[in-house]
Regions:
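Left-handed beta-helix
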Residues: 4-5, 10-11, 16-17, 22-23, ...
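Blade-loop segments of beta-propeller domains
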Residues: 45
Length: 178
């Protein structure tokens, strides 16, 4: 096990011997971290913000979670998931395998993202929302540019398989897309 002495660890953890826990990480009680995960990775911009993983969360193998993020209680992160910096993930959220959360995103409680979902930087997914496989939330209206205009999905919405939502769009309460 490769765990930084600066990480703060709760009780009853199950951390794989092949996982790496970096500085500035707080892991609460009952968290499970799978094989080959990188937890608390920094980048050139975010080098000293805390990553907080709240109690009873499960992070499956090969997932990477950057500093400055917050993962809520009882959440499940699938295999090979990337969660970039400054992402806030609520309680009881499920993020499927091979999904990509591009940073500065909010995913509220009780939301479910199936496998292979791409959430563009700056997107906001409100509570009780379902995104099915291969959904793409874009954020650059005139690529390649420095404009980042994330998608907002309001509560109780469903976005069906292979749907692409364009930058800056707001899907209203209870939307069904696909």
């Amino acid at each position: 096990m490769n765990i930084s002495s600066k990480a703060k660890l709760g009780k009853n953890l199950k951390i794989s011997d092949t996982a790496k826990i970096f500085d500035n990480v707080i892991i609460e009680d009952g968290v499970v971290i799978g094989d080959f995960c990188l937890i608390g990775l920094s980048n050139a911009v975010i080098t000293s913000k805390k990553l907080i993983i709240k109690k009873n969360t499960k992070i499956n193998s090969h997932s990477i979670i950057y500093q400055g993020s917050n993962i809520g209680e009882n959440s499940i992160i699938g295999h090979n998931v990337l969660v970039r910096e400054e992402s806030i993930i609520g309680n009881n959220v499920q993020i499927g395998s091979f999904s990509d959360i591009e940073g500065y995103c909010i995913i509220e409680s009780f939301s479910k993202l199936h496998s292979n979902v791409h959430v563009g930087q700056g997107s906001k997914i409100m509570c009780y929302t379902w995104l099915f496989p291969y959904v793409i939330l874009t954020n650059d209206p005139i690529p390649p540019s420095d404009i980042r205009d994330g998608v907002t999905i309001e509560p109780f919405s469903i976005v069906c398989t292979r749907s692409t939502i364009l930058p800056g769009k707001i899907l209203g309460f209870g939307s069904f897309v696909g």
